Amino acid sequence: MNLIQQLEAEQIAKFKESKSIPDFRPGDTLRVGVKVVEGERTRVQAYEGVCIARANKGMGSSFTVRKISFGEGVERVFPLYSPNVESIEVVRKGVVRRAKLYYLRGRRGKSARIAERRDNKPAAEAQEA
């Protein structure tokens, strides 16, 4: 591991101590709390939509969230380790078979829906106990 990778790993570890990043994948519906500066005051704005892409590049990791706002598709790329991202909450898990869901850009209505993923792991653990 070279020096840059080592520094990057230390920064990621320091960031994870202060904030927790949930395990999410493309297809999941996320609610991202973003710090917005308006004049002198800052507030947290919720941005809720479907994660359509995730790029894991160390400190440069990012994810793209797409939502429909007033009938218009809006996409926003968030840096995963940004101080402006206050919180990430997984609202719903989705079943998809692709890593990048760019095909959703051309779809409207029912064809753009994503089925919900049901994890059977917690139920299996409950039966063993």
Curated annotation (Swiss-Prot):
Keyword Ribosomal protein among record annotations: yes
Record flagged with keyword Transmembrane: no
Gene3D superfamilies the record matches: 2.30.30.790
A Pfam family: Ribosomal_L19
GO molecular function: structural constituent of ribosome
GO biological process terms held by the UniProt record: translation
Entries under SUPFAM superfamilies matching the protein: Translation proteins SH3-like domain
Keyword list, A-Z: Ribonucleoprotein, Ribosomal protein
Superkingdom classification of source: Bacteria
One GO location term (cellular component): cytosolic large ribosomal subunit
Family: Belongs to the bacterial ribosomal protein bL19 family.
Its biological purpose: This protein is located at the 30S-50S ribosomal subunit interface and may play a role in the structure and function of the aminoacyl-tRNA binding site.
Protein name: Large ribosomal subunit protein bL19
